[in-house]
Amino acid sequence: MSTEPSKTLETFENPNPERDYTIRMEIPEFTCLCPKTGQPDFATLNLEYIPERHCVELKSLKLYIWSYRDVGGFHEALTNQILGDLVAATQPRYMKLTAHFNVRGGIWTTVEAEHHGR
């Protein structure tokens, strides 16, 4: 597996697909670029999901998150793009992504996006 940023999300088979259980991940080092100023934006991402048949592989998730370092985008658009890519890769029963962006201009921004499967 590569150590370079990548838009590829790898998965593995859910070891207990007959059961609902929740996977929670905290990703404290998300960075992207402000589309207006080009300055870096920093966020902590909280991912919560109930898998169906596949779970996201952690190293590929890390490399995927790194791939946003030089990407410009509004907080709302990037949060929904990441959720959409994760849903496409894993097809979960439920998934929620919460992005807690650091203060910019005296304003903290939190964006929550959800997917309800089944």
UniProtKB/Swiss-Prot annotation:
It is an enzyme of class 1 (oxidoreductase). Substrate binds at V56, E57, L58, H75, E76. GO terms for molecular function: preQ1 synthase activity. InterPro entries: GTP-CH-I_C/QueF, NADPH_dep_7-cyano-7-deazaG_red, QueF, QueF_type1. Pathway: tRNA modification; tRNA-queuosine biosynthesis. GO terms for biological process: queuosine biosynthetic process; tRNA modification. One of its GO terms (cellular component) is cytoplasm. Keywords: Cytoplasm, NADP, Oxidoreductase, Queuosine biosynthesis. Its EC number is 1.7.1.13. It catalyses: 7-aminomethyl-7-carbaguanine + 2 NADP(+) = 7-cyano-7-deazaguanine + 2 NADPH + 3 H(+). It is found in: Cytoplasm. It comes from the Bacteria. Gene3D superfamilies: 3.30.1130.10. Pfam families: QueF. Belongs to the GTP cyclohydrolase I family. QueF type 1 subfamily. Catalyzes the NADPH-dependent reduction of 7-cyano-7-deazaguanine (preQ0) to 7-aminomethyl-7-deazaguanine (preQ1). PANTHER family: NADPH-DEPENDENT 7-CYANO-7-DEAZAGUANINE REDUCTASE (PTHR34354:SF1). This is NADPH-dependent 7-cyano-7-deazaguanine reductase. It comes from Halorhodospira halophila (strain DSM 244 / SL1).
